[in-house]
Amino acid sequence: MEKYKLRKNNTILLYDYSINFSIKDNVKLEKKRFNMNKNKIKKRGQLSVDFVLAILFLMLVSLFIYYNALTFTNNTTDALIVDRMYSIADTFENYAILSYTKNETIVLKLKPIGDLGYVIHVSNKIINVSYKTLIVFTPTDNGVIISGSNIETAPVDIGKNISITVTIDKNNITICKELTINIT
C-alpha cells in the first residue's frame, strides 16, 4: 500500500486528502512554516521565563507565610501560657480575698498548665504544682494563712507579692503581681 500517489495534474493523494502544489507554492509554504516556527519558539521561551518567575514568586510568598505562621504559633503558645499564669495569680488572690472577707476556710485545686508544672512563690511560701495540688486558705485577723501538701518554706520572703515561674524549653518565664491581702 502506497502512502501517496502522484497524479497527472500535479496533485498528490495523501491519505484521501488531495493537495495541489507547484514549486513556487512549495517554497512559499516552507518560508511560512519557518517563520511560524521561529515565532512559536520565541513565544515558548517567553512563556517558560514567565512560568519560572511565577513559580519563584509563589515560592517566595509561601516561605514568607510559612515563616510567619511558625513564628506566630510559637509566640501564641507562649502568650497563652503567660495568660494562664496571670489567670492563676488572679484566682489565687481572689480565693485569698474571698476567704478573708467571708471568714471561711476555702480550698483551691491547682492543676498544671497542660503538661507544664509551675512554681508559685507567695510571701515566704513556695508551692510546686506538677500535678493536682490542693491549697487551703484559712482566714486570720490580718490576712490569710495558706497550707497544703506541696508547700515549702521559702528562703526569701517576697512580701505581699505572688510570683509564678514556668520552665519552657530551658527558658524560665516568671510573672509577678502585687497582692492586696497578706498571705502567710
Curated annotation (Swiss-Prot):
It comes from the Archaea. It comes from Methanocaldococcus jannaschii (strain ATCC 43067 / DSM 2661 / JAL-1 / JCM 10045 / NBRC 100440) (Methanococcus jannaschii). This is Uncharacterized protein MJ1467.
